[in-house]
Structures are given as structure tokens and as C-alpha cells.
UniProtKB/Swiss-Prot annotation:
GO biological process, one term: glycolytic process
Pathway annotation from the record: Carbohydrate biosynthesis; gluconeogenesis; Carbohydrate degradation; glycolysis; D-glyceraldehyde 3-phosphate and glycerone phosphate from D-glucose: step 2/4
Membrane-traversing stretches: none
Gene: pgi
Pfam families: PGI
Catalysed reactions, semicolon-separated: alpha-D-glucose 6-phosphate = beta-D-fructose 6-phosphate
Subcellular location, principal: cytoplasm
Xref: CDD domains: SIS_PGI_1, SIS_PGI_2
Protein family: Belongs to the GPI family.
Gene Ontology molecular functions: carbohydrate derivative binding; glucose-6-phosphate isomerase activity; monosaccharide binding
Cysteine disulfide partners in this protein: none
Protein name: Glucose-6-phosphate isomerase
A GO cellular component entry from the record: cytosol
Length: 502
């Protein structure tokens, strides 16, 4: 059989007419057997549409593709980013697990950079600066923005951090209009310092601050940062080519995180991720949540034919998690060729999307309950929320449980307009509390789940060539928008350029 895929297709065919309530009735211990606790994180896969026999076939698929060996190669610093010839060592930013010379060197370098970062924070603490403007886009923005927003209520930092990513000048203006330049510092985050959005927004910030005295950079190209913005070397923090943007919040890209929540909280975030790394590397496939989560995604995509995947965060502090995961998953897995350049032989990543509960119940949940598509989902909540509004938290979690149950089980009615067909599989993820440790572990779990899927599909999760062509074309079209004579081949683009130029 084709590396286990044919056997799994037989199981999918066998289960086609089986409902999720049927599975729960057939496996009475399913709620416990399909649950896992990893530190402060609880996972329950009982409402996924597979049984124990199909699940064993999924684990066989993982063994056939040597997922365990793939984890070991990544953690040891082998060049698993084969298209760019690079190691992938974001895990070494938060811990040394493999003991190889490459990983140890990476961990040591990252620790030294954090020491420098904390020294810069101490210097800012002694100044009159109260606000930080962080300029970056994609992985230089989404991760830090998520963590700062999620952990703001337990922050130990004294700085208010404001994020600007969009090249639309309205975003920068809206931010600067509420700040005092004499009490503001800026951070420009770009691996290459060639990102158009960051350079344009950085120039606005440089001018508004009156120079580079309170301007910092996080980059793998310090010379370009110095040339473009006169940023002195002592205010530049390095990053490396073995850390991809969407995996970089653990590096100096996390500078705005540490400023916002404090150095100790940032270390707790790293520790939570490192704890999950150790778990992912050492726990057998059959018990490994990251492997199970990744295999479940493959099952829903390739054997149930689900073209989208939703993330529902039932905690307002995690409102940015669906957007963060959208980049992590779709930029990593949105590939049409394998590592060897041959076309993939099955569908890869579905469209990831989502929102925050209970708001989503009043927007797109109608389509989930009574539409024509089956949409697998992750529901993410917190067990304990140490705020003043405990009644609200009870109501939030009641809605969380109710929606999962109805989406899976449905409800019949004599009135066709009131039929809930059910059949939507979901995974429940609960954090004991939204702490830096729990958030770090949660993000690490998703990183490793993505890697598992990439190994099964035979694709490279660590490049993103698909984002390049549009950026290059935009640079070529910019002079034409300014009125310069530029040859434009596409007839529609030519016509629209004339309208944009007035």
C-alpha cells in the first residue's frame, strides 16, 4: 500500500456513514482515551471522526514516514530546510535538547543575545520612555503582537507597545497621533532590512522621532540597518538565517514582547515552549499530542475532504491566535511540490481561519451549523481566568461546550429549517490558565503539528517562495504609479494604473 494512505482510505470509506455520536457510543471510554494532558495544556480528540482502528492506521502512517526521525533531525540541526540549505533551529532559541554541537552553539548564541536584549531594556527602564512602536510585518509582527495582547493583563513590563505592520500610512498615523515623540522609542524588525513595508514605515518613524537616538533594530543585516537609519551597533540585535520569520518570536524578534511583559515573563514563555519541545521529541508517537494533532489534520484534509479548518479562541486574550496560526500553518504548508521538486500527490493545507468566541457564534456559526460544508475546528479555552468577572467566564465556557456538542452531534427536527446535521469534528484544547508557560507550550504544539504534516506530505515547511513574486512586481509597478514611464505588459494592470494615476 502507498505508505499507508491506501489503508487509511479504506478506513475513511468504512466510517463514512458513522456519526460522531456513534463513535462515542461504540467506545465508551473514548472521552478519556482520546484525551492528553501536557503540563498546563489539556487536549481532547474524542469528537474527531476516527475510531481506534483508524487511529492506529494514522500512527502507522507516521511510522512509515519516520516522523520520529524527522523530529530528531530538526532538533539536531540537520538541514531540514532542504530548498534553502538551512538548519531549522527555532527550538534551540528556547532550550538545548539534542546536545549536538550545532544546537548547542545556536542555544548559546541565543542566550547571549537575550542578555544584550535585557540590558537594552534596563537602559530604557532608566529613561523617560513610556511607549514603544514596533514596526515589522508577517513573522516579525504577528507572533509578538499575539503574545503581547494575550499576556498584557499579567504584564510585568512598564512599556506600552504599539505594533504597525501595514504599509498603509493610515496605520502609522493612527499610532503616532496618540503618542509623544519625546517619550517614545521605536523598533524596526526585519531579517533582511529589505522589506518594503518596514522600510517605508521605518522612515516615517525615524523622521517623527527626529533621528535614530531611540531607534532599535532586530535584523540579520546590521549594515543595512546602519546605512538606512543610522542605527548604532549597540542598538541592533541579531537574528539568524536558521530561524524563519513565523518561528522567530522566541528570538530577538521577541524584543517588544520582553519590553511589554517583562524579562521574567518572556523567560517563562520560552520555558513553556521548551517543555513542550522536550515532550514532542521524547514521547512515543502514539501518546504524542503534536503528532496526533498533525495526523488529525491530515485525516480531515486527505480522507474526509475538508478544505477549510477553523480555530475558535474562547478567551478574548487569544483573539489574535487565529490570525497568527493562519500564517504559521498556511505559509508553512501552502506548497504544491515536494522537497524533491516533484508535484504533491494529494491536497496539502486547507484554508485556516477563525475568530473569538462568543462573537463568532453571531457571525459565521450559522454556516457551520446548517451550511453544506464540514469544517473541522480547534476550540481553545481556559479553565481558570483570574479576573473579576467570574460569571462571564462561566458563561463563556458554557457556550464553548455547547457549540462543540451541537456541531458534532446535531439535532433532528420535523421542521427542515430547524435540522442541525452535525458531523463537524473538533479538538478541544484547554489551558489551565493563560500564563506565559501555557501560551509558550500551545504555540510550540502548533509548530510541531505543522512539521508533522509537512513530513507526511513530503513538503518543506520552512520556505515561502510563494510570497516573493508579488513583492517584486509591486516594486516594479511603484514608479509607474508615480507617473514614470514604465513598460507594463498586463493589459488589466495597465488600465487600472491609468485610473490610479488620475
Amino acid at each position: 500500500m502507498h505508505n499507508g494512505f491506501d489503508a487509511l482510505q479504506l478506513h475513511a470509506n468504512r466510517l463514512r456513514g458513522v456519526t460522531i455520536p456513534d463513535l462515542l457510543a461504540a467506545e465508551l471510554k473514548r472521552p478519556e482515551q482520546y484525551a492528553r494532558q501536557v503540563g498546563p495544556l489539556y487536549f481532547n480528540f474524542a469528537r474527531q471522526k476516527y475510531d481506534c482502528v483508524a487511529l492506529e492506521a494514522l500512527f502507522a502512517l507516521a511510522r512509515n514516514h519516520n516522523v520520529t526521525g524527522a523530529f530528531q533531525r530538526m532538533f539536531c540541526g540537520e538541514q531540514v530546510n532542504v530548498t534553502e540549505g538551512r538548519a531549522v533551529l527555532h527550538t534551540a532559541l528556547r532550550g538545548d535538547l539534542s546536545g549536538t554541537s550545532v544546537a548547542v552553539a545556536a542555544y548559546t548564541a541565543a542566550a547571549k543575545v537575550r542578555e544584550r536584549m535585557y540590558a537594552l531594556i534596563a537602559g530604557l527602564d532608566a529613561s523617560e520612555v513610556t511607549d514603544i512602536v514596533s514596526v515589522g510585518i508577517g513573522g516579525s509582527d504577528l507572533g509578538p503582537r499575539l503574545v503581547v495582547d494575550a499576556l498584557r493583563p499579567i504584564s510585568q513590563g512598564r512599556f506600552r507597545v504599539h505594533f504597525v505592520s501595514n504599509v498603509d500610512g493610515a496605520a502609522m498615523r493612527r499610532t503616532l497621533d496618540m503618542l509623544d515623540p519625546s517619550r517614545t522609542a521605536g523598533i524596526l524588525i526585519s531579517k533582511t532590512f529589505g522589506t518594503q513595508e518596514t522600510l517605508l514605515n521605518g522612515r516615517i518613524l525615524y523622521d517623527w522621532l527626529g533621528g535614530s537616538e531611540r531607534l532599535y533594530a532586530v535584523t540579520a543585516n546590521p549594515e543595512r540597518a546602519a546605512n538606512a537609519f543610522d542605527i548604532v551597533p549597540t542598538q541592533v540585535l541579531p537574528i539568524w538565517d536558521w530561524v524563519g520569520g513565523r518561528y522567530s518570536l522566541w528570538s530577538a524578534v521577541g524584543f517588544p514582547i520582553a519590553l511589554a511583559i517583562g524579562s521574567q515573563r518572556f523567560e517563562e514563555l520560552l520555558a513553556g515552549a521548551a517543555e513542550f519541545d522536550a515532550y514532542a521529541l521524547r514521547v512515543p508517537l502514539e501518546e504524542n499530542v503534536a503528532v496526533l494533532h498533525g495526523l488529525t489534520a491530515v485525516w480531515n484534509r486527505n480522507f474526509l475532504g475538508c478544505a477549510t479548518y477553523a480555530v475558535m479562541a474562547y478567551d478574548q486574550r487569544l483573539a489574535l491566535l487565529p490570525t497568527y496560526l493562519q500564517q504559521l500553518v498556511m505559509e508553512s504548508l501552502g506548497k504544491r511540490v515536494k522537497c524533491d521538486g516533484t508535484p504533491v500527490d494529494r491536497d496539502t493545507v486547507p484554508v485556516w481561519w477563525g475568530g473569538v468566541g462568543t462573537d463568532v457564534q453571531h457571525s459565521f456559526f450559522q454556516a457551520l451549523h446548517q451550511g453544506t460544508n464540514i469544517v473541522p475546528a480547534d476550540f481553545i479555552g481556559t479553565i481558570r481566568n483570574d479576573d473579576l468577572y467570574t460569571e462571564n467566564h462561566f458563561a463563556l465556557n458554557a457556550n464553548l461546550l455547547a457549540q462543540i456538542e451541537v456541531l458534532a452531534n446535531g439535532q433532528l427536527s420535523d421542521n427542515p429549517h430547524r435540522v442541525y446535521p452535525g458531523g463537524n469534528p473538533s479538538t478541544l484544547i484547554l489551558l489551565d490558565a493563560l500564563t506565559p508557560q501555557a501560551l509558550g507550550g500551545l504555540i510550540a504544539m502548533y509548530e510541531h503539528s505543522v512539521y508533522v504534516q509537512s513530513v507526511i506530505w513530503g513538503i518543506n515547511a520552512f520556505d515561502q517562495f510563494g510570497v516573493e513574486l508579488g513583492k517584486h512586481l509591486a516594486v516594479q509597478l511603484l514608479p509607474a504609479l508615480k507617473g514614470e514611464s514604465v513598460e507594463v505588459a498586463d493589459p488589466v494592470t495597465r488600465a487600472v494604473l491609468l485610473r490610479l494615476r488620475g
